[in-house]
UniProtKB/Swiss-Prot annotation:
The lineage of its organism: Bacteria, Pseudomonadati, Pseudomonadota, Gammaproteobacteria, Vibrionales. This is Large ribosomal subunit protein bL19. PANTHER family: LARGE RIBOSOMAL SUBUNIT PROTEIN BL19M (PTHR15680:SF9), RIBOSOMAL PROTEIN L19 (PTHR15680). GO terms for molecular function: structural constituent of ribosome. HAMAP family: Ribosomal_bL19. Gene3D superfamilies: 2.30.30.790.
Length: 117
């Protein structure tokens, strides 16, 4: 029985997702429906958490909007998420970056990960 469920979930999962990790700055293109038309809205911020649960995977992106911290959680394989683009890789040593919630300004910066040769 569980093999059938796994097969169905595998069928629903997106295959074209880039590899990203906490600390990375990403741009998520979100499908927004306004009346009878649909458009794409870009949401750019730092990934502060990733939840890997197969089809139910999710990630949280934090950005500062008008001086106020805004977090949004996206379902990774949701049809609402059109695309994910990694802008820069961050060098962090934690899986969850919840400590960024209490920080602002220069203390909330994340070092950039240098590419391997």
């Amino acid at each position: 029985m569980s093999n059938i469920i796994k097969a169905l979930e595998q069928e629903q999962m997106k295959q074209d997702l880039p590899k990203f990790a906490p600390g990375d700055t990403v741009v998520v293109q979100v499908k927004v429906k306004e009346g009878n038309r649909e458009r794409l809205q870009a949401y750019e911020g730092v990934v502060i958490a990733i939840r890997n649960r197969g089809l139910h995977s999710a990630f949280t992106v934090r950005k500062i909007s008008n001086g106020e911290g805004v977090e949004r959680t996206f379902q990774t394989h949701s049809p609402v998420v059109d695309s994910i683009e990694v802008k820069r890789r961050g060098a962090v040593r934690r899986a969850k970056l919840y400590y960024l919630r209490e920080r602002s300004g220069k203390s909330a910066r994340i070092k950039e990960k240098l590419a391997k040769k």
